[in-house]
């Protein structure tokens, strides 16, 4: 069954017996960052989309870099794709992610995520009940400080390297 995408809904190209079309939400339902020994994006997909793949690209100092997410499940059993090798030096890079079904057809519009936009959204998110907003702000500030230190280290190691005409120091 061919699928196409309109607004935020994936639609079947063939109507059902009653003349209506099957409409599903976008396969990608959330994106987040996991920080542990390393950093990764975690992309949750809607139930029923665990048999597909998630491809991504970003444009860095070495041009366009492409990759494919690794599928797994979280502790609640949700299907999660992970994009590894995300690091503070790439905090300002925009990753463009696209879900593909098992047949290789792109489903839904591409989505964009970056470390900085994730934390901007996290910072501006409405506080939950009994949440310590100051702790959230401190976490974000500490993480951005960590990113800045990593950028300074990159500048020391690669002073002439540029991205979009900007050195590590400028970025």
Language model features with spans:
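Short, surface-exposed linear motifs at loops/turns and structural transition points
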Residues: 1-171
């Amino acid at each position: 069954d061919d699928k196409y995408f309109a607004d935020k809904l994936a639609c079947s190209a063939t109507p059902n017996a009653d003349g209506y079309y099957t409409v599903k939400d976008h396969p990608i339902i959330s994106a987040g960052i996991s920080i542990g020994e390393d950093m990764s994006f975690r992309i949750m997909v809607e139930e029923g989309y665990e048999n597909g793949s998630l491809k991504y690209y970003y444009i860095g100092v070495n041009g366009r870099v492409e990759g494919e997410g690794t599928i797994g499940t979280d502790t609640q059993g949700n299907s999660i794709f992970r994009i590894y090798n995300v690091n503070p030096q790439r905090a300002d890079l925009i990753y463009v992610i696209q879900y593909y079904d098992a047949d290789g057809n792109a489903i839904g519009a591409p989505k964009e995520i970056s470390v900085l936009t994730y934390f901007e959204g996290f910072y501006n998110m409405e506080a939950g009940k009994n949440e310590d907003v100051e702790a959230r702000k401190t976490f974000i500030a500490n993480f951005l400080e960590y990113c800045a230190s990593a950028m300074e280290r990159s500048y020391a190691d690669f002073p002439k390297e540029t991205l979009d005409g900007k050195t590590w120091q400028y970025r």
